[in-house]
Amino acid sequence: VDAGKIVTFMGHGNPEGWNYGNGNSRYTMLEEELQKTYSSNYFVATVDMEDNYVDNMISRMQAAGKASGDVICHPLMSIAGDHANNDMKGGVSENDPEEGSWRYELNKAGYTCPLSNCDIKGLADYSEIVNVWISHISAALQSEPMYDQDAEE
């Protein structure tokens, strides 16, 4: 990360009551690991995880002493669709992002987040990540099933 730049990742998350397999905790763990391993300028928030929305992320950024600076936004989703284009980027207007979008909220909070700082590539656009998925699928296909398909539900 270039000095002074802040990198954010937008995950989907699960709304309260729908936290499958404690998946929401993985976003917090990812942020902690990114900060510990690479840079304290990495932050992860979600569209749907209570207590980990963009405003919560901004509060964490400020608490970490990062009250201003250039912010780069990346979707942390397989495909960069509606959430990346609208909830993160806030549309296509350079100077008038949609209210409530990450770009709008970050600029309102005193950060610099122009349209060009919103990367609209999903995880599936990176061959390295797709190769990890393929490896995991291959290993899963070669292992014992985790459940009995014939068992009554």
Where are these regions (language model features)?
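Extended amphipathic ligand-handling, pore-lining, and cofactor/metal-binding catalytic surfaces
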Residues: 1-153
